[in-house]
Amino acid sequence: MAAAYLDPNLNHTPSSSTKTHLGTGTERSPGAMERVLKVFHYFESSNEPTTWASIIRHGDATDVRGIIQKIVDSHKVKHVACYGFRLSHLRSEEVHWLHVDMGVSSVREKYELAHPPEEWKYELRIRYLPKGFLNQFTEDKPTLNFFYQQVKSDYMLEIADQVDQDIALKLGCLEIRRSYWEMRGNALEKKSNYEVLEKDVGLKRFFPKSLLDSVKAKTLRKLIQQTFRQFANLNREESILKFFEILSPVYRFDKECFKCALGSSWIISVELAIGPEEGISYLTDKGCNPTHLADFNQVQTIQYSNSEDKDRKGMLQLKIAGAPEPLTVTAPSLTIAENMADLIDGYCRLVNGATQSFIIRPQKEGERALPSIPKLANNEKQGMRTHAVSVSETDDYAEIIDEEDTYTMPSTRDYEIQRERIELGRCIGEGQFGDVHQGVYLSPENPALAVAIKTCKNCTSDSVREKFLQEALTMRQFDHPHIVKLIGVITENPVWIIMELCTLGELRSFLQVRKYSLDLASLILYAYQLSTALAYLESKRFVHRDIAARNVLVSSNDCVKLGDFGLSRYMEDSTYYKASKGKLPIKWMAPESINFRRFTSASDVWMFGVCMWEILMHGVKPFQGVKNNDVIGRIENGERLPMPPNCPPTLYSLMTKCWAYDPSRRPRFTELKAQLSTILEEEKVQQEERMRMESRRQATVSWDSGGSDEAPPKPSRPGYPSPRSSEGFYPSPQHMVQTNHYQISGYPGSHGIPAMAGSIYPGQASLLDQTELWNHRPQEMSMWQPSVEDSAALDLRGMGQVLPPHLMEERLIRQQQEMEEDQRWLEKEERFLKPDVRLSRGSIDREDGSFQGPTGNQHIYQPVGKPDPAAPPKKPPRPGAPGHLSNLSSISSPAESYNEGVKPWRLQPQEISPPPTANLDRSNDKVYENVTGLVKAVIEMSSKIQPAPPEEYVPMVKEVGLALRTLLATVDETIPILPASTHREIEMAQKLLNSDLGELISKMKLAQQYVMTSLQQEYKKQMLTAAHALAVDAKNLLDVIDQARLKMLGQTRPH
């Protein structure tokens, strides 16, 4: 078979069409004694069902049995005796069932004289069914699938337009379920999935034209969705059996009926029924029960001939065991009698397990061929094929040329390499078909070229050999710096494919081994190089279908190449390629590829997005711990792979565009290449900036150290906290809350004690750049600014002086005591602002540190355009540290804008008059009490939401809602006594609270919907963010009402 693929006379270039490759009839190979026969069948392939066919070479001695045997052998069929061979004339209803003993050449000469070869269709069909055939076929999957496709085709051609709408809908939905059995039961509810089925696949493949024409599109869609849900849980085999169950009452596909007469004249007109259950029986009327004539094991001989009258009818005689005389049947023509004889003979051979025919007829020249050549064992076949070429002239079992995939099979003669020029080396990997070895190619241009050699373990099988060479014949068409280059092939057994050697191996292993040495720019560079290779494939109309880090090879530290083209396909004139079977990489595949086995450049884009994610994750596989069957469910629920650590947001945004559910919304590879180029350049610029900043920082640290090993008691600069600190320094309780978080960025000790670094461990200074320090340590930088004491210490250190150990110890102890005193004072003064100031967005801290505050400098409680609350009174300065708090305020850094746990007076220390909430009597203030109640409800929900199961979300949100309703009712009672000019602003604040509650409920529903997925935590965070917004806006409402009250008091105050 492989030889046929490699023969340029039998194959076409990638731009030609498979449909015009061969006619329905035959062709002769130039200079050969063989002829070529195209046989249509129902073995599934990726082409349209109407083009499923095999091309078979045959000699003059080949009989029909040999043709059937060769086709079914390639599909590993068990019930070979069930198959028959039909010849149909395409321009008339003329049909001939060819007996297995008939010679193919004689048949062709006989019938092709009557009509041109292209008007005849040779077809392999299942004709002879055993009793309980469905149960037997379930153990022979190729036969079951073949029979299903055959029956479905007959149904669509013959009766589909006449059946009830309900039956047509069920049968069509069962075919959808069988074809796309991995698709979830509710997949057709998605508009994009239904549109793929409707526009790309075509509804006419599943439903009759009468149904599609008579029902409106919107109604039809609803009917299909409703019907499909009935079969949502069926697998492929169950769908097939259910199809037969629904179809059998309206279409008897398990028997054949012939209108004829019993006897030698038209005395009794009957309908003769022949099938596995009835045997041979007849019906006189449609409504009556069949009358049994004989079983197949009772038939001893079969004869047929022309009648002697002028009508030249066909006569069929069956000798039945125990019957006094033969059973005679008169058929309308000799052809029908001959077809009936073939059917009964096939059943007799099947029931008796015989190969010898039961038909007795006079021998006519050319009518019967020599007996079939017995089937040889594999070793005997191999021995025969190693002889001279002339043996092929008498070998009736020549190769089959399946039309599937022939579009990527040009000649390999230019790439053939002599085996003696290859030195096979050590094994460096394992492929789908065999091992991959390192070797040397002794070529004239390069006497010692290092190469990779793919070997094939089981290439004695023609089908395996073809699939193995498929990759080479695909690769030979590519020439790109980031695609592995084909050097040559050896097509004689053992078959080898010789490719360029990428010395650093596959990308996934490379990323895992060098996880800590590869920088972000290198990872983005790899993604960019792959995008250029895939843009090249897209331009040549190829789909790769297996884009993953394991299939990318590393040529050097700055060069990767796309390899493994075993699944690649040329798309011809079609916009997509459909895979019919075989193992596919589910966790990398696009949803339409999983659901419909539909592969396009857009599905390659999805896979490339997953491959980029693998690269940024240093070789981690996607959807770890998730079963293949569960992947599509998660994707359809909106789940996507999370953002990798240190991944630029622009790059992750590009990945998510690649993972758009609708293929039409994904970018093309040309766009991806351009955007990745931009991201790469940006990362290089940032990398250079970080290196310059790091150099300056190292220089500063080196200058500050002054040759001393002493660590400073506190960070020396507000924007650049030194990683060094004293062993006696302990962070405040605010910092202790997030110990785990800080261990990443500068608190590796188990008790939060900072590690010694600086000049002692210079390598640690570059672990985090300035941006990362700000992200990881906002509170630390804003909290610990140098006091006068620290400045003195730094001055001493700068002059090269070292404090005595006992003075250093005293200073550290005193400093720790002062910090504890500061903390107690701050906690006391915290009560100055009401309600609880810890309710700022981002400051309602949970232990997991999920929330970050806004990035602006405005305090979160204060509405835009409103003054800040008054600052608390300043603490009297300690001796030796005057103005400590004012210094802290005056040198506040941008890091304070994170506002994560930072107290409000640190953000806005200046005093503002009049304070909106501080100087009012709250003794009977119902609005204030209800705002406080709402805030408490939010705090309670925030503390309970993390461990709570989804069913407890509703009661917690309900408590918040009740608190809000009470607050709004109180505000409604308060509004009439306030100035009319303030009503509008209060109503707007109320509407904002209602909107906040709606957002909270929406996020709660999402958190419940995506429970047990990786998105659950994300939606919990969004739920808490919405609750925090509600609390903050409630405080804003209180501020608005307080200002209205102050305005009212100002109007009533005597001048």
UniProtKB/Swiss-Prot annotation:
Instruction: Provide the gene name from the record.
Output: Ptk2
Which BP terms in the Gene Ontology apply to this protein?
angiogenesis; axonogenesis; blood vessel development; cell migration; cellular response to morphine; cellular response to transforming growth factor beta stimulus; central nervous system neuron axonogenesis; endothelial cell migration
According to its record, what are the GO cellular component terms? Answer: apical plasma membrane; basolateral plasma membrane; cell cortex; centrosome; ciliary basal body; cytosol; focal adhesion; glutamatergic synapse
Task: Give the sites modified to Phosphothreonine.
Answer: T13, T917
Please provide an example of a Pfam family that matches this protein in its UniProt record. PK_Tyr_Ser-Thr
**Name of the featured protein:** Focal adhesion kinase 1
The free-text domain remark for this protein reads: The first Pro-rich domain interacts with the SH3 domain of CAS family members, such as BCAR1 and NEDD9. The C-terminal region is the site of focal adhesion targeting (FAT) sequence which mediates the localization of FAK1 to focal adhesions.
The role this protein plays is:
Non-receptor protein-tyrosine kinase that plays an essential role in regulating cell migration, adhesion, spreading, reorganization of the actin cytoskeleton, formation and disassembly of focal adhesions and cell protrusions, cell cycle progression, cell proliferation and apoptosis. Required for early embryonic development and placenta development. Required for embryonic angiogenesis, normal cardiomyocyte migration and proliferation, and normal heart development.
Supply the InterPro entries for this chain.
Answer: Band_41_domain, FADK_N, FAK1-like_FERM_C, FAK1/PYK2_FERM_C, FERM/acyl-CoA-bd_prot_sf, FERM_2, FERM_central, FERM_domain
Residue stretches of biased makeup (Polar residues): 10-27, 886-896
Q: How is it modified after translation?
A: Phosphorylated on tyrosine residues upon activation, e.g. upon integrin signaling. Tyr-397 is the major autophosphorylation site, but other kinases can also phosphorylate this residue. Phosphorylation at Tyr-397 promotes interaction with SRC and SRC family members, leading to phosphorylation at Tyr-576, Tyr-577 and at additional tyrosine residues. FGR promotes phosphorylation at Tyr-397 and Tyr-576. FER promotes phosphorylation at Tyr-577, Tyr-861 and Tyr-928, even when cells are not adherent. Tyr-397, Tyr-576 and Ser-722 are phosphorylated only when cells are adherent.
Main subcellular location of this protein, as a coarse class: other
Please give the activity regulation comment for this entry. Answer: Subject to autoinhibition, mediated by interactions between the FERM domain and the kinase domain. Activated by autophosphorylation at Tyr-397. This promotes interaction with SRC and phosphorylation at Tyr-576 and Tyr-577 in the kinase activation loop by SRC. Phosphorylation at Tyr-397, Tyr-576 and Tyr-577 is required for maximal kinase activity.
Region annotated Disordered sits at 1-29, 685-734, 837-923
| UniProt region (Interaction with TGFB1I1), positions on chain | 707-1055
Give the active-site positions. Answer: D546
**Family stated for the protein in its record:** Belongs to the protein kinase superfamily. Tyr protein kinase family. FAK subfamily.
